[in-house]
Amino acid sequence: MGTLSVNQNKLQKRLRRLAGEAVTDFNMIEEGDKVMVCLSGGKDSYTMLDVLLYLQKVAPIGFEIVAVNMDQKQPGFPEEVLPTYLKSIGVDYHIIEKDTYSVVKEKIPEGKTTCSLCSRLRRGTLYTFADRIGATKMALGHHRDDILETFFLNLFYGGTLKAMPPKLLSDDGRNVVIRPLAYCSETDIEAYAKLKEFPIIPCNLCGSQENLQRQVVKEMLREWERQSPGRTEIMFRALQNVHPSQLADRKLFDFAGLRIDDSAAPRFVDAVNL
């Protein structure tokens, strides 16, 4: 890749800045961390690795990066692509070989979406491997749009107000998961992946289509952004500005314990009489 144009340079700086802000805001990476970067071969994980390698060079703390890919034995998976790329940029890496593809095909009827089960099997394997190599953080490539899509999926179909947190502790308590691209837009990531000419591996090798509900939500958000540019950013800010007293979850706010403050009236009268 040659010299960047002005716009390309702005794009690169924006992604690096936003990832750096997310890492700082949520204390994602600390001195001495061993960060296991989960690399699928898609645009998001390539971009995440690229940005984290930059942050590793300029950060005031020292941390280690190791890339990990899981070869799930999908037919046609190009086994040589990731090792070749990672060797070319000098990054330590591991390839986990585990045939979850056969398990998924056995459990899920033909024509049904396999993504959910496939994801759970992959996540469990990665958690175990992170523990084995002593990784203190496990980095996933989810971005701002993924987080918002998950929020609306849970809202529309699950009846819950939750999304993907930028940082979380796994259910088994053994792994801290981080999402350094939490502030980055999918549009920027797509443009950056093309600019950097990452060797993208198709995500549909298994023949499964993305969850239909997620596709609907993704298109809904894109249409909203087309109609009202900046709306996506505003919605994401809402996830960082929650007021439990203005919702209806009794576990988060003590509605039953609300009482009139008897001292409020005298204070109000005193203020008026001043």
From Swiss-Prot:
| Source organism | Azotobacter vinelandii (strain DJ / ATCC BAA-1303)
Q: Which reaction does it catalyse?
A: cytidine(32) in tRNA + S-sulfanyl-L-cysteinyl-[cysteine desulfurase] + AH2 + ATP = 2-thiocytidine(32) in tRNA + L-cysteinyl-[cysteine desulfurase] + A + AMP + diphosphate + H(+)
Q: Which HAMAP family match?
A: TtcA
What further note is attached to this protein's record?
The thiolation reaction likely consists of two steps: a first activation step by ATP to form an adenylated intermediate of the target base of tRNA, and a second nucleophilic substitution step of the sulfur (S) atom supplied by the hydrosulfide attached to the Fe-S cluster.
- Listed binding positions for [4Fe-4S] cluster are 115, 118, 206
Supply the InterPro entries for this chain: Rossmann-like_a/b/a_fold, TilS/TtcA_N, tRNA_Cyd_32_2_STrfase, tRNA_thiolation_TtcA_Ctu1
- Protein's name in the database: tRNA-cytidine(32) 2-sulfurtransferase
Report the locations given in the UniProt record: Cytoplasm
